[in-house]
């Protein structure tokens, strides 16, 4: 597998030379390798590129997944990832892959929020998020929205992050996906003082390895390629690109895409456009507000 894939600039910036590890987890169309504390995602070029990863042709990832099991050995050296599965050694020469910049670009002046407002108009975030509705959640979303709009400070972000981290099920709990999206929006808006509310030493101990890796990448200014495209669509006011990217994000996982998009929307300052914090205090998805 040489020269046929893409690799994130975040991966290329890591010191992975000579590291050993193993297959951490496998999914329907992707997998994770953990080496020397770094979680490397391997996906298909037909999907959005993970900021933690590399992507290879779809037929090749399918073949790799067919023979690979959790715990299989992996070794990285000179831009080559070797995975030792039941089929033998597979070489992925990611050093020859096309690099994709996963650095979150600044929105700058004159960006267009209306294209995002239009793209999310039909999404039922209250029904699609994996975060259980509660009055506490409503308060947290209100505080994060106020912080994004300049009416709250970094302590509100810090308290909200403690509430959300690890909240939910799966390898990337819904609260973590939300925080990744929210932090990406803050980065795009150059609100670096609020980003200080993400204390990675504390947060990483309270969630999964996978979530901790994505939150760490977010804190260092990186995001998955779909979110990079989303920020770019707002910079230039491209409604079609925004609509397509929102759909792409929403297709990720069971609720992960909606959770991360919700965080981004709140970080951009559009919580009121999707019903405000009150709808997330519902006891059920039918709209009854918790007392």
Predicted regions located by residue number:
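Phosphate/adenylate-binding glycine loop and adjacent helical scaffold
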Residues: 1-154, 158-159, 166, 170-175, ...
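Conserved phosphate/anionic-ligand binding catalytic regions in large, soluble enzymes, centered on
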Residues: 170-187, 256-268
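Small-residue-rich helix-loop
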Residues: 203, 207-208
């Amino acid at each position: 597998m040489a020269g046929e894939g893409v690799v994130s600039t975040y991966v290329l910036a890591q010191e992975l030379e000579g590291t050993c590890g193993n297959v951490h987890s496998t999914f329907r169309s992707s997998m994770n390798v953990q080496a020397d504390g770094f979680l490397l995602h391997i996906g298909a070029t037909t999907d959005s590129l993970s900021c933690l990863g590399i992507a290879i042709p779809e037929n090749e990832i399918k073949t790799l997944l067919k023979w690979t099991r959790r715990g299989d050995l992996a070794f990285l050296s000179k831009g080559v990832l070797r995975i030792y599965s039941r089929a033998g050694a597979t070489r992925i020469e990611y050093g020859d892959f096309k690099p994709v910049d996963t650095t979150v670009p600044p929105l700058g002046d004159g960006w267009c929020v209306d294209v995002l407002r239009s793209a999310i108009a039909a999404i039922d975030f209250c029904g699609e998020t994996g975060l259980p509705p509660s009055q506490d959640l409503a308060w947290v979303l209100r505080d994060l929205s106020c912080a994004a709009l300049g009416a709250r400070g970094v302590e509100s972000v810090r308290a909200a992050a403690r509430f959300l981290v690890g909240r939910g099920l799966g390898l990337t709990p819904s609260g973590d996906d939300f925080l990744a999206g929210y932090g990406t929006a803050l980065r795009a808006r150059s609100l670096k003082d609020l980003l200080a509310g993400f204390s990675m030493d504390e947060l990483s101990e309270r969630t999964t390895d996978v979530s901790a890796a994505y939150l760490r990448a977010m804190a260092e200014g990186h995001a998955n390629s779909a979110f990079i495209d989303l920020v770019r669509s707002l910079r230039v006011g491209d409604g079609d690109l925004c609509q397509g990217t929102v759909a792409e994000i929403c297709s990720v996982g069971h609720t992960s895409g909606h959770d991360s998009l919700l965080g981004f929307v709140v970080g951009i300052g559009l919580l009121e456009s999707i019903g405000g914090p009150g709808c997330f205090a519902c006891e059920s998805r039918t709209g009854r507000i918790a007392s």
